[in-house]
Structures are given as structure tokens and as C-alpha cells.
Amino acid sequence: MVQRWWEITVTCQAEAEELVYWRLQSFGCQGTATQLQQGRVLIQGYVPQQRVSLLDIAALGVWIEQDVVAQGYLSPKLHWQLVNEQDWAHSWQAYWHPIPVGDRLLICPAWEMPPLDNTRLVIKLDPGMAFGTGTHETTQLCLEALEMQLDQTFEPLPPTVIADIGCGSGILAIASLLLGAQKAYAVDTSDLAVTATQRNAELNGIRADQLIVHQGSWEQVLELVDGVVCNILAPVIIEILPHLPAIVKPKGWGIFSGILLDQADRVAEQLKRQGWSLGSVWRRNEWCCLNARFERLPD
């Protein structure tokens, strides 16, 4: 019997994309597609028909509108319909093509070949039901920050271990290994993210002893790391900051994104309280990435 899914479509301002992603993920949506249409984004998420009712979907619409309007954005539009599993599993792939990021990386869908003249490091990716295709500003900011932290232009990179907290599809952890890190931890509270990360590691020829994947959060990082990357929403970053001294070496670096511009000061203040010094803030549209260094244990 063919399983049927609710296809939930949200049209909103591009700046509200991450908020909608987070709400869809919290609701239980397992796959997403994003299209840009005349300055607005169309985001589609999918959830099994038997898991939710029409009343649940109506409530989701209310939550999304509250989230988006509270940040000062225009009211989003919500539409839903029933589709067969095979239909949604393949339809969104048509909208995703190889994407160059930074100076050295190319994100390439697993079902496509990179350009013949490509000279970049290729990250093969099939996000499946997890979040993270590399198209969003916050992901690209994190990838560019990883390029900076793992740069080997002037001297070889010493053995480096990183942790990707909230790994989604595993794109950031995988990129760090391709850029020269020796080992990476990838953790996420979603079992779908764990599965997607493991699959993407195989696609990129990464061994299980290079990429340690666990379901959970920071507590699953079993050694002190040289750097940590967190591309998650600001409230979650603030929640886990007090725990990071347990896993980050003194003078270790941190890349923090998923942060709206008007949230940056609040996150920066919490970083300072937890013993981090802020090096730079990178901005792209309404999103930013904070690059920091861990200086001391908090008082």
C-alpha cells in the first residue's frame, strides 16, 4: 500500500525561512524543499497522513504565523494537500543543483555530477528527510567560517577535532573533514539527522572512525575538541553555551549561526558570560554568523 503524506507549503519572506524550517521540523516534517519566488520563499514540508489531523495542521499554521509576525515579517501563507510518497520524494530534487560556496567548496546533490571543469572540494549530499542542503545563508556562512578556521595556505593544519552540534544532514562536519580536520563529531537530537549524516559520510568516502555520529547533543562529544560549530537557532545556542566548556579546549574556536541580526547582541553577551571572546560577526541578509574563541572558564 502506498503511503500518503501531507504536503505542507508555506510562502513567506526569505528572512523568515529559518523560523519556518524550525517550526516544520518541530511539527515532525521529514523532508523539505525551498524555492525562491519573487523575493519570497516557498517552503514545503512532508508528514505522514496518519500522524496528524487537519486540526493539527491548522494549529501549525497559527504557530508559524505567530513566529513570523513576532519577528516583524509579513504574514506567511499556508497550503496543504495529500500526495503519494514517491511524488514528494523526487519532485523537490528538480530544484537543487551544484552550489559553489566560499573559495574551496562545491555542494553537489548525490544524483548529479559536478561540472567537468570543477576544481573545488566536492561535498556530495543527499539530505533525505533531514534538514540541510547548503542553500541557506546560515549554512553557507558556517562553511565559509570553516574554510577560514581550517585554512592551510601558509602552514599545515595540526591534528584538529571538531564538533558539529545540531548536524542536520551532516554537511558542516563532512566539510570540516574534507577541508583537513582529522576527526569530527556530528550530533543531533533527530534520528533522521543521524541517518542522513551517516549516509552522506558514505557518499563522501568518510570512514566511521573519522566522523563520529550520535543522537543527542553536546554530551555525546566524548573528548575535548579544537572547534565547535552550531548552526541552530539563537535560543538553542544560548541554552547549550554553559555546557560547551566541558567539550572545548582552551583557545578553541566556535562558529555560531542560525542567528537573526536582531538576536546577535543577545548571543554575543551570552558568549562573553561563558568565557568566549567574539572575533567577528559575518552578515548575510537578515542572518549572521559569530566567530568566537574560548578564553576561559566562566566565573
UniProtKB/Swiss-Prot annotation:
Q: Does the keyword Electron transport apply?
A: no
The record's Gene Ontology cellular component field reads: cytoplasm
Location(s) in or outside the cell = Cytoplasm
Record InterPro entries? Ribosomal_L11_MeTrfase_PrmA, Ribosomal_PrmA_MeTrfase, SAM-dependent_MTases_sf
Note the superkingdom of the native organism. Bacteria
Per UniProt, S-adenosyl-L-methionine binds at T139, G166, D188, N231
Q: Where is the signal peptide?
A: none
**One GO molecular-function annotation for this sequence?**
protein-lysine N-methyltransferase activity
Give the UniProt record's GO annotations in the biological process aspect.
Answer: methylation
Q: Please provide the record's keywords in A-Z order.
A: Cytoplasm, Methyltransferase, S-adenosyl-L-methionine, Transferase
Q: Its catalytic activity?
A: L-lysyl-[protein] + 3 S-adenosyl-L-methionine = N(6),N(6),N(6)-trimethyl-L-lysyl-[protein] + 3 S-adenosyl-L-homocysteine + 3 H(+)
Please state the Enzyme Commission number of this protein: 2.1.1.-
Q: What does this protein do?
A: Methylates ribosomal protein L11.
Among PANTHER family, the record links this protein to: ELECTRON TRANSFER FLAVOPROTEIN BETA SUBUNIT LYSINE METHYLTRANSFERASE
Q: Which HAMAP family match?
A: Methyltr_PrmA
Question: What NCBIfam families does this protein's entry cite?
Answer: prmA
Similarity comment: family membership: Belongs to the methyltransferase superfamily. PrmA family.
- Specify the protein name: Ribosomal protein L11 methyltransferase
Per the UniProt record, the source organism is: Thermosynechococcus vestitus (strain NIES-2133 / IAM M-273 / BP-1)
